[in-house]
Amino acid sequence: MNSSIKRLHKEYASFQAGDISGLLLLKPVTDVDMFHWKAVIEGPTETPYEGGQWVLDIHVHEGYPISPPSVYFQTKIVHPNISWTNGEVCMDILKTHWSPAWSLQSACLAIISLLSNYDASSPLNVDAAKLLRTGDKTAYNSLVRCTTYLYAKGKIEDLS
């Protein structure tokens, strides 16, 4: 068993042993492929994402944990640092600031934190960033609440 797979088995066991606020599910998609994972996250309280649940599609590469995973929102979401078209997440820790000290669990927690702390200067969703840059936080929050209701409030299919 290679070191990436050993590490992923340990991470899965660690997630199963704990109760992580905001991270409802983190597991391999199948028992035979440890390099493709799903996660379900909850929107942070006191944000326009509150009450929503999003499915993340996580692809782990052979060089893990030296190389970062690729993470995509499978559920539609409005956020300046998340692509509306393909769900790609723009975060330094998933690119140039990745460290082997990070885990899939800590990456998911960082994504939950990103929902509260956007960076409108480096957007993947230009329309969302424009609302924030022009100071129209009310319109941004309304758009987020609306799309959260439309896409992230339904029952998530059984992924367990």
From Swiss-Prot:
Q: Where does the record place the catalytic residues?
A: C90 (glycyl thioester intermediate)
Give, as in the UniProt entry, the pathway in which the protein acts.
Protein modification; protein ubiquitination
**What keyword terms does UniProt attach to this protein?**
ATP-binding, Nucleotide-binding, Transferase, Ubl conjugation pathway
Q: Which CDD domains match?
A: UBCc_ScPEX4-like
Look at the named UniProt entry and state the broad enzyme category this protein falls under.
transferase
Provide one Gene Ontology biological process annotation. protein polyubiquitination
InterPro entries named among the record's database cross-references: Ub_conjugating_enzyme (IPR050113), UBQ-conjugat_E2_core (IPR000608), UBQ-conjugating_enzyme/RWD (IPR016135)
- Return the EC number: 2.3.2.23
SUPFAM superfamilies (UniProt xref): UBC-like
Gene Ontology terms, MF aspect: ATP binding; ubiquitin conjugating enzyme activity
Q: Which reaction does it catalyse?
A: S-ubiquitinyl-[E1 ubiquitin-activating enzyme]-L-cysteine + [E2 ubiquitin-conjugating enzyme]-L-cysteine = [E1 ubiquitin-activating enzyme]-L-cysteine + S-ubiquitinyl-[E2 ubiquitin-conjugating enzyme]-L-cysteine
PROSITE patterns per the UniProt record, alphabetical: UBC_2
**Function comment:** Catalyzes the covalent attachment of ubiquitin to other proteins.
Q: Which PANTHER family match?
A: UBIQUITIN-CONJUGATING ENZYME E2
Family statement drawn from the similarity comment of this UniProt entry: Belongs to the ubiquitin-conjugating enzyme family.
Q: What is this protein called?
A: Ubiquitin-conjugating enzyme E2 16
Q: What species is given as this protein's source?
A: Schizosaccharomyces pombe (strain 972 / ATCC 24843)
